Regions:
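Compositionally biased terminal segments of proteins
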Residues: 1-134
């Protein structure tokens, strides 16, 4: 559910960064990383996807589809722990990615990528197969 103050969007010249500001959903929601000699808690990819799908999965964004496909392909076992949170909006999410508005495809094409460069159709197939298997 969307609540006031639940989402934070930072805008930079290089692009936007969205944060879902909500309590953790998974038991192992974060890892401790060393950043310049300091211990920093960083949410796991599965936690990030769980929050995106649970709190706004009924309003697909290109970035959410991209991130979901990436995590499915790189960390599928970890993502299975998020199953209860992925099911909430699964049907609406699947309908929206399979019958996309032109703006969803355009948004996807505008994503700056580095080492993961899938097509929109590839991400739809990966997300669809995974979500239907739950």
């Amino acid at each position: 559910t969307e609540q006031p103050g639940m989402f934070v969007k930072l805008q930079f010249d290089e692009g936007e960064v969205d944060f879902v500001s909500a309590p953790n959903l998974l038991n192992d929601a974060w890892e401790t990383w060393d950043f310049r000699g300091r211990a920093v808690k960083v949410e796991t990819a599965a936690e990030i996807i769980a929050k995106k799908m649970y709190h706004r999965g009924d309003r697909v964004t290109a970035r959410d589809l991209f991130d979901l496909a990436l995590v499915i392909e790189r960390e599928p076992q970890q993502l299975l722990a998020a199953k209860p949170f992925l099911l909430r909006h699964r049907n609406v999410f699947l309908t929206q990615i399979r019958q996309p508005h032109a703006s969803l495809r355009a948004g996807f094409d505008a994503i700056a990528t580095l080492k993961y460069t899938p097509s929109f159709d590839h991400c739809v197939a990966v997300a669809g197969e995974f979500l239907e298997s739950l």
